[in-house]
Design a protein with these regions (language model features):
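Domain-level signal for Mg2+-assisted phosphodiester chemistry and nucleotide/NA-binding surfaces
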Residues: 1-107
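Extended two-metal-dependent nuclease catalytic cores across DNA- and RNA-processing enzymes
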Residues: 85-197
């Protein structure tokens, strides 16, 4: 059995650049409908990728972000400011609406969607891998988030997000994780502890 854990925001963001839209009616105050277009490219891309993974012996677990209130609070208490991801530039495309729409679709069709208020997807993915590690022959984490690369182990690999990102397993880990360094998969916890990202 395989478990594929998907960091859905990666897929939605990547697919959002396709500029696909869906027409939706919006009731106006004068009781007339006016066409309104909503972006759908990210949702479409995510659903296509999921359909490509569906086969016997494969479980698929989509994971969605929530506002990282817990980390922000911890950061503020530890460092005395609100700086957790505060200095990052805003993304070129806002995917919030598409994330909500994709999550609703996946829940409605019966996928075991995971999202925990106060936490980002990478926090939830870490917990899922630790919980299910011994229940599956192979776990694939579909993400471009390098913070999750330390989870690579004998039965845990990083999978691409569509055509983007890296495929990382214990054999390719030393060559792909940190450019110009030779880092063995089973030493990454120590490296992150000593040197950070």
């Amino acid at each position: 059995m395989e478990l594929h854990i998907l960091d859905c925001s990666n897929y939605i963001y990547a697919g959002s650049f396709s500029k696909k839209f869906i027409a939706r009616g919006v009731r106006e105050s004068n009781n007339e409908y006016q066409a309104n277009e909503a972006p759908i490219g990210g949702v479409r891309f995510l659903l296509r990728q999921i359909s490509g993974l569906m086969r016997p012996g494969v479980d698929i677990m989509p994971v969605f972000d929530r506002v990282p209130e817990i980390k922000r609070e911890m950061y503020a208490n530890t460092f005395g400011n609100e700086g957790y991801k505060a200095n990052r530039p805003s993304k070129k495309i806002d995917i919030t609406g598409q994330q909500a729409y994709a999550e609703q679709i996946l829940r409605d069709v019966g996928f075991p969607v995971q999202a925990v208020d106060g936490y980002e997807a990478d926090d939830v993915i870490y917990s899922l891998v630790k919980y299910y590690k011994n229940d599956y022959e192979k776990i694939y984490i579909h993400t471009k988030d390098s913070d999750l690369f330390f989870l690579v182990d004998t039965n845990v690999s990083i999978a691409r997000v569509g055509d983007q990102g890296k495929e990382i397993d214990i054999y390719s880990y030393p060559l792909l994780v940190k450019s110009g360094e030779h880092t063995l998969y089973n030493t990454v916890h120590l490296r992150k502890l000593c040197r950070g990202d």
